[in-house]
Amino acid sequence: NRVMPSPDGFTWTVRVAAAANQWLSVTFGNGLFVAVSPTGFGNRAMYSTDGITWVSSYPPDSYWVSVTYGAGRFVAVALSGTVKAMYSTDGITWSSSASLTLSNGRAITYGNGLFVAVFSSGGMVSTSNDGNIWTSRTSPVGDWQTAAYGDGMFVVLSASGLPRAMSSPDGVTWTARTATGDNNWQSVTFGYDRFVAVSNTGSGPLVMVSYNGMDWQSRVGVSDPVWLAVTYGAGLFVAVSDIFAGNQVMTSYAVTVWASGV
């Protein structure tokens, strides 16, 4: 099972992906869902107008790990491969960026007119106005894994080492922050006036929340804690796991209490 949509975050239905690839990231923009994959042969992206029926598209065969939408275009970054970033104005036809040369891309987000990509090697950050021309930025060194934007703040979290968090109001100047635990932070999102992050391992609770992107508080999720991704929509936070038994989805309205899903 590689795709499952839900109209409410509680009831899920298995759907067929466009290809049997390892789909690592999905985003939505301009009426289209777009997903990217590090595997496959010539078909490492797919798109859907409804989240149910998916169609392959054909970007370069890099190890695509993250995609986002902003400024009228989709932009993706790769962990490895000849092409490190690509962009598309329609989510179907992709153009390579020759400007970004950094390897080990992990995540990309968009906010305040800027795409921000983070890298696990050397703790690098790179920014772009259009997904094509990129500029490297100086930041605290970290094993950066995930990024989000909300309420005038970029937030980036790390999977190991210190610092485990950093923030920036403009994507250019970054400040190290303290996470709630030395956890392997996998995903962060913004919604309901707060940032919410999840992790798959760690020394403390595997969920944390921040109301300003700088100060973090622990929250307790449900059991079977191998949380890999979290997102927000329609008033609900939804986190998903890659375990094959137990709690694979958990939901929360305000992050104070989580409920088990699938």
Which role fits each region the language model picked out?
Residues 1-262:
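Residue-level hotspots at or immediately adjacent to binding/recognition sites across diverse folds
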